[in-house]
Amino acid sequence: TKSPDCGGILSPSGLSYFA
């Protein structure tokens, strides 16, 4: 499960998600 966080991968939703 990915949590919304900075320095992660760019999700299709346009948010930065931590891999």
From Swiss-Prot:
Keywords: Developmental protein. May play a role in the developmental transition from cell proliferation to cell differentiation during neurogenesis. This is Tenp protein.
